[in-house]
Amino acid sequence: MGFKRGDVHLVNFNPSKGTEAGKIRPAVILQSDCLNNAEHPSTIVIPLTTQLIANAAPLRLTLKARDKLQQDSDVMIDQPRAIDNQRITSDKLTFLTETELATLENYLKIVLGFDD
């Protein structure tokens, strides 16, 4: 199964600890396509939730339901995680538009302190 930056796949986040996102849920592939194309054994992702929070930028980015993403979902930008590729359990559900991916990258810069 190939992965591409900005694609959304189902990921098995179990087991989780404390405030970590758990269960099987959609996640955005964040990792560079350079690593994805090299079939790197792990992938950096950000989980989604259907527990929407309005006006929560830069911690959340809302994606509208489309393609195989069945519900509106928030990208939990404060929860990026490296996972083993075996945790990715589906083909692509949908993908982020160029605008959504650029917004996600800007929010990540804020959350991770890259612009400090």
Please state what every model-predicted region is.
Residues 14-18:
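Short, charged beta-turn/beta-strand-edge "cap" motif at the junction between a beta-strand
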Residues 1, 65-116:
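C-terminal terminal-subdomain/extension
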Residues 20-24, 28-65:
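Compact nucleic-acid interaction/catalytic patches
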